[in-house]
Design a protein with these regions (language model features):
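C-terminal catalytic/acceptor-binding lobe
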Residues: 1-8, 12, 33, 160-238
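Short loop->beta transition adjacent to catalytic acidic/histidine clusters or analogous donor-positioning motifs
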Residues: 7, 11-24, 79
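Short, hydrophobic beta-strand segments that form beta-sheet elements in well-ordered domains
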Residues: 20-28, 107-110
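Short, solvent-exposed loop/turn segments at secondary-structure junctions
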Residues: 28-32, 47-48, 87-89, 114-117, ...
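Short, Asp-centered acidic motifs that coordinate Mg2+ and/or phosphate
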Residues: 80, 107-108, 184
Length: 238
């Protein structure tokens, strides 16, 4: 999914005509990852979840959300930041839409994705053909995984040691952008699960939820970390 995500962002950036968009990736210092231009890397992250939470096994190097955002904050002077999970693709008008919403007075935005099929008419969706997804309705997804916020708001956010990769990082992030903004807007918040989206802006290929399989110690620990900061993530859809 990541090649599709990357190319969709490049395509959307190239079709943006009402604002300047810089694309950044963030990686751990041990990761051997390359990104095509115009993507740039922030400084490498120096730690991950098991470096700060002793109970976690050293199997998954999941970064802390505050470290990711701090790295972006230092790398960019942009007035507004957009964070998406690494497997979330965007539509061609994505950045234009966000720019219009900001100009209309919103200072934070959450966009719920649509889950798209892995195959269409016998074709497996990949980086060469993913735009055929844009005529699909997809399926409703309740999770929060795309956020827009002002750079000054980040300085007020409290994440503790919550890390990415498993819930409830999305609920915690949503809680924080709502608390630190003056005019919040939520796209695709509600609706008939079988009906069309309010606006198709982001997508995910498939609906796999690997973090649900077996007993997930990372999910359990992330819940504990969120509760330490009194995040009401359990009620974040209300």
């Amino acid at each position: 999914a990541q090649p599709v995500t990357i190319q969709s962002m490049i395509n959307a950036r190239n079709k943006t005509d009402n604002c300047k968009v810089d694309l950044f990736g963030v990686k751990n210092k041990f990761d051997k990852v390359k990104l095509p231009s115009p993507f740039k890397f922030t400084n490498d992250l120096e730690r991950c979840c098991y470096d700060v939470i002793d109970s976690l096994p050293k199997k998954k190097s999941l970064p802390l959300i505050k470290d990711i955002l701090s790295s972006l904050y230092r790398a960019s002077s942009a007035e507004y930041f957009i964070y998406t999970n690494s497997d979330i693709g965007v539509l061609p008008d994505f950045y234009n839409f966000i720019s219009e919403k900001i100009k209309s007075g919103f200072d934070s935005i959450c966009i719920n994705r649509r889950d798209m099929p892995k195959h269409i008419s016998g074709q497996e969706i990949d980086v060469s053909n993913f735009e055929i997804l844009f005529s699909e309705l997809g399926k409703y997804h309740m999770g929060a995984d795309c956020f827009v916020f002002h750079r000054d708001a980040f300085k007020k956010m409290i994440f503790g040691n919550v890390f990415v990769g498993v819930p409830p990082v999305g609920g915690v992030f949503l809680d924080q952008i709502r608390k630190t903004s003056n005019n919040f807007h939520w796209v695709n918040r509600k609706g008939d699960k079988q009906g069309p989206p309010e606006r198709l802006l982001t997508f995910h290929i498939g609906s796999d939820r690997n973090w649900l399989k077996n007993e997930n110690i990372y999910w359990t620990e992330n819940n504990k970390q969120a509760k330490k900061n009194n995040h009401p993530f359990e009620n974040h859809l209300k």
